[in-house]
Amino acid sequence: TYTGNTNRYNGVVESQDSYEVNVDSSRTIKEILVKVGDEVEEGQTLVTYDTSELEMQVKQAKLELEGIQNEIDSSKKKIATLTDELNRTTDEDDKFSLTTDIQSEENSIEENKLDLESKNLEISKYEDQIDASSVVSKKSGVVKEINENGTDRNGNNAAFMTILQAGEYR
């Protein structure tokens, strides 16, 4: 009878590669869609952000956009009225005053056009953030750790989630 030696080793077998998933700390997490031990596929949604505040900001910005457009329309009507008056008057003082008023309204329109452009960019920024309201897995693997508070045991910054890649082990 053969009573050979059997080699036994202590340790942990884990994937050679792991990657860290970070979240935007300035945003509120709505839902974590996975838990430790879950297998995840590349492209799978792991976390979703709460977008309700961003949606409210978009609505508010669109209302402000409408207000700015109304100011532009009002200035255009004033210019039309002032131009009619300018064409009818013969008094030089009135012509000067009306011309100044027209230029003032034209300047107001230009300022409001810049405000429109700025507000449209703001809306685009909010909409881009709403579109990017989830964090997806970049690789397939298994969720090793979820760290909701963003720090490790020693209080140092740590990844929100660690995923062990499927594949070779060590």
Language-model segments: which ranges?
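Short charge-dense sequence patches
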Residues: 10-13, 93-97, 105-109, 133-139
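Surface-exposed patches in structured soluble domains
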Residues: 12, 31-33, 39-45, 136-170
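Short beta-strand-turn/beta-hairpin segments enriched in glycine/proline and small hydrophobics
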Residues: 4-29, 121-138, 162-165, 170
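Residue-level signal for the solvent-exposed faces of long alpha-helical coiled-coils
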Residues: 28, 53, 57-60, 64-67, ...
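Long, amphipathic coiled-coil "stalk"/hairpin helices in large membrane-associated assemblies
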Residues: 6-60
